[in-house]
């Protein structure tokens, strides 16, 4: 029996033997396609090739592409674990022709691989094919050339309510490349329910699609017209998990070797004996998606891809909880996964430590709120009406306890309940509106500035240039002329001003003529043109005017030093912390550099010191900074780091500082690292789960920062009458003395409180034979209240004690009840009721509880209420 890894390799070997280039799987994070959340098909990495926007050095390709379908348009998450074939992560085997072969070869390649004894050797009678209803060419190839009998070929027409809307017609979008497709189905046999494709029973488990071959032969225009493409292409996809199920003679993907290994590993970790438990399937599926997403640079967060990852992890953790998990377990599956995935698991092995750290941290974080959230949900489920959980409760679980909506839906599904999703969305919308109301945005010129052509940037080597004004925009609209005093955006035909990109801020400076001065405060890119944003301080300017554009040189030099230092910092972080470090955001300004990066745990002081030492060592080495322009493939072979989420063209700019740092970058840089002068880290901390931020200063700013630190040190030493070298020792002595004094003071306060308590014993009232003390206290700290209550309870032996005090305009309440009375008078209930009287809230145990409030004027009423409440209970 062939393993999954053997089937994967045989597919690639077969198509390599047919002249195809084996192309590695692309990242799950699409590199050049903002329309996609995750890579979800083999053709994603070739999209620009099919559109004619990119050329590759080959016309035939084959891949084993890792894919994720969770979130966005293609979302299989809610079905995972409940069906035989839904997964969050899967592998799509594919072969592609870019204007090379077409239908004849594509069909015959597929049939040979599936049926030849040298390859998969499937029984021909077990295979059925579908073709688009009018695709006679494909039908004839299957029937007359391949030899598939007519009763095994099915024509499928427009079955989705519109022309060319069919299971057998594929389109990239409403316009663009499209064409008919032919699909191959495997018959699992009569023991499974289901009908042939196109029949009412087609959704059954008997006939399963294993391969889809798309013939891109048309270009659909906006009016619906179909034009023939000059070079038709082929895009195919064979689901590896489905084909493995066929080859291993099982009907469910979860019965195949990879999933069975993972399921048994989970069962062993959690001591589960029933291997058919759906939660085992969920966990086995989710560890694949989570591990590969983290390996490809995604970190759990509350936005975009990071939130989808968080949702999958939390769903897995919840199902682990159902299986009896009492501690973090999910991360322990990574080594087994890396092994069982074979060659495709190498990326997991390389990043195993990082993946496990990230998973463990996220699992432990969610575990802290999981039990409380489930308790709230269980309580809410007992009160549902019309078998529907309210959107308000679902939103509270999401907002307060971190429950993704699909996790709550999972629990409801198990109880045959639904969620009021409209109500949930209403709560989400209200929250977004509140957030939007708190923001204030100025004029957005992105949709306003429309200028033919492009701005040529000549600022790498020049800080001043002659240019022509080709566009003017003021008050949100295009104008021909601006006058003195007007704020505007000026577009030039060429410019030395750098527009904000890649984290580097835009340049400032001056645009001038002999009689006009326009102060440039910022430079931004709008499409292909650079916008110089500022104010005209004298004269007037019109479209067509010749001007001198001058960059603020001192500011540019400072920005440039910070940008080069950022590259050194990035490499130093990877050297000290590990290769998992990837840039997640940056700011390069004249005053400071800020760098956000993936890192699952806090960074120690010694690590920060080592990072700083490495950067300064590279600065002292005065390394020549090299800048080369080359094609993207050559840059990658050179080892250049591409930044997560950035889009690069075919030709890229590579900035190198020997082998220590090589990055793709369009920013400005120093000529030698010595020009940076000095590097000093000034802050480090977390900005989100799995994301840390460091800030640093360089050159003159770093020297000024050190001067200020020295000044603070000297002033502190003078104030404490100590030498700066013994300052730490002096502060430690003062701290120890302060702690002793504070302890002595607290002991005195407790003694006074005990004395006051003895006086209060004499003032105890009897209510139905029970000792009751209800008092408003003056000048008593909150810390002492509990001591006083405990002393009174001990002295009276059987009593109810209620104290109220005011400090800093806030009310503090405490209720103590001896254990013999706590079944009648619950301290938590009483203090909660009192808190409402003073505009607050609180609670606690039946024998001791505290609360606070913001309305001290109502304290007397609250104490009177307490007496009446106690009397009613007794």
Curated annotation (Swiss-Prot):
GO terms for cellular component: cytosol
The terms under GO molecular function for this entry are: alanine-tRNA ligase activity; aminoacyl-tRNA deacylase activity; ATP binding; tRNA binding; zinc ion binding
Sorted keywords for this record are: Aminoacyl-tRNA synthetase, ATP-binding, Cytoplasm, Ligase, Metal-binding, Nucleotide-binding, Protein biosynthesis, RNA-binding, tRNA-binding, Zinc
For Zn(2+), which residues are the binding ones? 563, 567, 665, 669
Its Enzyme Commission number? Answer: 6.1.1.7
**What does the record note about the cofactor?**
Binds 1 zinc ion per subunit.
State the Pfam families in the record.
DHHA1, tRNA-synt_2c, tRNA_SAD
Q: Does the keyword Protein biosynthesis apply?
A: yes
Where is this protein chiefly located?
cytoplasm
Subcellular localization is given as:
Cytoplasm
* InterPro entries in the record: aa-tRNA-synth_II/BPL/LPL (IPR045864), Ala-tRNA-lgiase_IIc (IPR002318), Ala-tRNA-ligase_IIc_anticod-bd (IPR018162), Ala-tRNA-synth_IIc_core (IPR018165), Ala-tRNA-synth_IIc_N (IPR018164), Ala-tRNA_ligase (IPR050058), Ala_tRNA_ligase_euk/bac (IPR023033), DHHA1_dom (IPR003156)
Q: Which cofactor does it need?
A: Zn(2+)
Reactions it catalyzes: tRNA(Ala) + L-alanine + ATP = L-alanyl-tRNA(Ala) + AMP + diphosphate
GO terms under biological process: alanyl-tRNA aminoacylation; negative regulation of DNA-templated transcription
Which domain of life does the protein's organism represent?
Bacteria
Family under the similarity heading: Belongs to the class-II aminoacyl-tRNA synthetase family.
Q: Which PANTHER family match?
A: ALANINE--TRNA LIGASE, CYTOPLASMIC, ALANYL-TRNA SYNTHETASE
Record text about domains: Consists of three domains; the N-terminal catalytic domain, the editing domain and the C-terminal C-Ala domain. The editing domain removes incorrectly charged amino acids, while the C-Ala domain, along with tRNA(Ala), serves as a bridge to cooperatively bring together the editing and aminoacylation centers thus stimulating deacylation of misacylated tRNAs.
**What does the function comment of this entry state?**
Catalyzes the attachment of alanine to tRNA(Ala) in a two-step reaction: alanine is first activated by ATP to form Ala-AMP and then transferred to the acceptor end of tRNA(Ala). Also edits incorrectly charged Ser-tRNA(Ala) and Gly-tRNA(Ala) via its editing domain.
Under what name is this protein listed? Alanine--tRNA ligase
What is the protein's species of origin? Answer: Actinobacillus pleuropneumoniae serotype 3 (strain JL03)
Gene that encodes it:
alaS
């Amino acid at each position: 029996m062939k393993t999954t890894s053997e089937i994967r390799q045989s597919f690639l070997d077969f198509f390599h033997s047919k002249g195809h280039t084996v192309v590695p799987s692309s990242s799950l994070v699409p590199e050049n396609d903002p329309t996609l959340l995750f890579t979800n098909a083999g053709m994603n990495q070739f999209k620009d090739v099919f559109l004619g926007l990119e050329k590759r050095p080959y016309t035939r390709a084959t891949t084993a592409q890792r894919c994720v379908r969770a979130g966005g348009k293609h979302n299989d998450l809610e079905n995972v674990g409940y069906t035989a074939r839904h997964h969050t992560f899967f592998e799509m085997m594919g072969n592609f022709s870019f204007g090379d072969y077409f239908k004849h070869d594509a069909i015959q390649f597929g049939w040979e691989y599936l049926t030849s004894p040298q390859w998969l050797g499937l029984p021909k009678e077990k295979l059925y094919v579908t073709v688009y209803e009018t695709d006679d060419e494909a039908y004839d190839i299957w029937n007359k050339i391949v030899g598939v009998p007519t009763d095994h070929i099915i024509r499928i027409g427009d079955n989705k309510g519109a022309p060319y809307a069919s299971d057998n017609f594929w389109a990239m979008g409403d316009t663009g490349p499209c064409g008919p497709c032919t699909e191959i189905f495997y018959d699992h046999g009569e023991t499974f329910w289901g009908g042939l494709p196109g029949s009412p029973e087609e959704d059954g488990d008997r006939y399963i699609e294993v391969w889809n071959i798309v013939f891109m032969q048309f270009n659909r225009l906006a009016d619906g017209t179909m034009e023939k493409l000059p070079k038709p292409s082929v895009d195919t996809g064979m689901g590896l998990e489905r084909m493995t199920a066929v080859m291993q003679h099982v009907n469910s993907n979860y019965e195949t070797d990879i999933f069975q290994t993972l399921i048994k590993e989970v069962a062993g970790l959690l001591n589960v004996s029933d291997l058919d438990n759906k939660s085992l399937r969920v966990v086995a599926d989710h560890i694949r998606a989570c591990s590969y997403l983290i390996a490809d640079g995604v970190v759990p967060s509350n936005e975009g891809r990071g939130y989808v990852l968080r949702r999958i992890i939390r769903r897995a953790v919840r199902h682990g909880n159902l299986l009896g998990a009492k501690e973090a377990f999910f991360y322990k599956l990574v080594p087994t996964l890396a092994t069982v995935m074979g060659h495709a698991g190498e990326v997991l092995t390389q990043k195993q430590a990082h993946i496990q750290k990230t998973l463990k941290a996220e699992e432990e974080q969610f575990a802290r709120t999981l039990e409380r959230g489930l308790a709230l949900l269980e309580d809410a489920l007992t009160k549902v009406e019309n078998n529907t959980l309210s959107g308000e409760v679902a939103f509270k679980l999401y907002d307060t306890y971190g429950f993704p909506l699909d996790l709550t839906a999972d629990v409801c599904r198990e109880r045959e309940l639904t969620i009021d999703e409209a109500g949930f969305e209403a709560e989400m919308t209200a929250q977004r509106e509140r957030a939007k109301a708190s923001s204030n945005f100025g004029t957005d010129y992105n949709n306003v500035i429309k200028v033919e052509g492009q701005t040529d940037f000549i600022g790498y080597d020049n800080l001043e240039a002659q240019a022509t004004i080709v566009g003017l925009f003021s008050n949100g609209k295009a104008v021909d002329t601006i006058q003195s005093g007007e704020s505007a955006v000026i577009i030039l035909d060429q410019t030395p001003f750098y527009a904000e990109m890649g984290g580097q801020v835009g340049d400032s400076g001056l645009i001038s003529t002999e009689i006009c001065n326009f102060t440039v405060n910022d430079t931004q890119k709008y499409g292909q043109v650079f916008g110089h944003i500022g104010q005209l301080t004298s004269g007037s300017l019109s479209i067509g005017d010749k001007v001198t554009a001058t960059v603020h040189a001192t500011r540019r030099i400072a920005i440039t030093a910070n940008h080069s230092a950022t590259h050194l910092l990035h490499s130093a972080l990877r050297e000290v912390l590990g290769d998992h470090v990837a840039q997640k955001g940056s700011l390069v300004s004249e005053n400071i550099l800020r760098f956000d990066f993936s890192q699952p745990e806090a960074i120690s002081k010694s690590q920060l010191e080592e990072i700083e030492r490495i950067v300064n060592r590279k600065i002292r080495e005065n390394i020549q900074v090299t800048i080369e322009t080359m094609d993207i493939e050559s840059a990658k072979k050179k080892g250049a780091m591409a930044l997560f989420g950035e889009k690069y063209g075919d030709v890229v700019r590579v900035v190198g500082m020997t082998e220590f740092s090589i990055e793709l970058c369009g920013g400005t840089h120093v000529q030698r690292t010595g020009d940076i002068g000095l590097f000093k880290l000034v802050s480090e901390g977390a900005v989100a789960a799995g994301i840390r931020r460091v800030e640093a200063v360089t050159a003159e700013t770093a020297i000024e920062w050190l001067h200020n630190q020295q000044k603070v040190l000297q002033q502190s030493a003078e104030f404490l009458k100590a030498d700066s070298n013994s300052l730490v020792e002096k502060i430690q002595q003062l701290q120890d003395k302060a702690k002793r004094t504070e302890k002595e003071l607290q002991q005195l306060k407790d003694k006074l409180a005990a004395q006051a308590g003895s006086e209060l014993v004499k003032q105890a009232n009897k209510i139905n034979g029970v000792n009751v003390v209800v008092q408003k206290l003056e000048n008593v700290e909150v810390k002492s209240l509990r001591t006083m209550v405990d002393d009174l309870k001990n002295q009276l032996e059987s009593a109810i004690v209620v104290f109220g005090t005011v400090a800093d305009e806030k009310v503090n309440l405490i209720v103590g009840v001896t254990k013999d009375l706590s079944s009648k008078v619950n301290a938590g209930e009483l203090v909660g009721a009192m808190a409402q009287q003073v505009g607050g809230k609180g609670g606690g145990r039946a024998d001791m509880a505290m609360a606070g409030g913001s309305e001290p004027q109502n304290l007397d009423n609250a104490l009177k209420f307490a007496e009446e409440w106690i009397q009613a209970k007794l």
